[in-house]
Amino acid sequence: MKYGRTFNFSAGPAMMPEPVLEEIRDEMMNYRGSGMCVMEMSHRSKVFQQIADEAQADLRKLMNIPDNYKVLFIQGGGTLQFAMVAMNLMKNGKACYVETGAWSKKAIAEAKKYGEVQVVASSADKNFSYIPDCSDLDIPEDADYVYICENETINGTTWHKLPNTKGHVLVSDQSSMFLSRPCNVSDSGLIWAGVQKNVGPAGMAVVIIREDLIRDDLDPKTPIYMKYKTHADNDSMYNTPNCWAIYCCGKVFKYLLSIGGLEEMEKRNIAKAQVIYDFLDSSKLFKGAVVPQDRSLMNIPFVTGDKELDAAVVAASKEAGFDNLKGHKSVGGLRASVYNAMPIEGAQALVEFLTKFEAEHK
């Protein structure tokens, strides 16, 4: 690759589009005549305010976000949102969660600190290898919301059809599939995503929340930073935001618009994921970990069935110029994360490597 860069299959932080990195490089020392790097700017300056405004406007255009939704840029990444969602949305103290893998499990554990949590569906019975049927969930009338992790980064499943929430608010963690395909924002009351997988550097989450869900009647002990209203009322600048992440994400939003938006991005993602899945389906050594109908376009876990052989694949992949193919420590095996910025050439090169490895280990 250009600049001696590697095909980085990390689950996050992950690859960013090369044209975006080049533009950031060119603006590093003197952003548009300001005499300083964006990292050095006051978040109260007119120059940075324009950066933040453009980032929000471009994201709204990219996702066709309705006017009655607020876009918030909040520090703390994804894990903070496990708590913020529950603290802000549990008005009746009751919520429903669908358990589909490691990250929805973490969200459930955190939400239990703030109210009653009902797991209305789970795929734990088959090691989270599928998305459960959620067409007729048993949802209590007084449940405040239904929560899903729309793409499980570790387990490699994704929702291709959203659950029937029977009129209840849907909350979706889109972290590892954010901006990878079109979505109807109004299907959810709140969408959030840690940005370090598909759109920027670590340390920030994007929250898209319907205005009627922004409450002022929270528990008085709720930290002011943990209130969505604090961020909504101050246009994400109650305190110094993650200026660098906002700037970098804004660049990615513009890049996605320039290539044809999320429809084009989805086409590219389908094409490169299919390259890998086609190989796995025909391989006698490597096996995918997810049922075909629920496979993620972003995170592809697979195994040989032999831990020592899995480790040998990881070692050989590094020698071949690939990075981060080792599966998550909680599940082992192998995983290729092919986020938006991964070119199809990366998927093709990976399959070529795996094909050679299989031939050498018959």
State each model region's role:
Residues 12, 111, 123-178:
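Active-site phosphate-binding strand-loop segment of PLP-dependent enzymes
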Residues 171, 185-196, 205:
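Conserved active-site segment immediately N-terminal to the catalytic lysine
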Residues 5-56:
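A glycine-/small-polar-enriched, mobile loop at the entrance of the PLP active site in fold-type I
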Residues 195-277, 291, 360-362:
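Active-site C-terminal subdomain of aminotransferase-like
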Residues 34-81, 88, 102, 110:
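Conserved N-terminal alpha-helix of the aminotransferase class I/II PLP-enzyme fold
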Residues 1, 6, 319, 332-362:
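PLP-dependent enzyme catalytic core of the Aspartate aminotransferase-like
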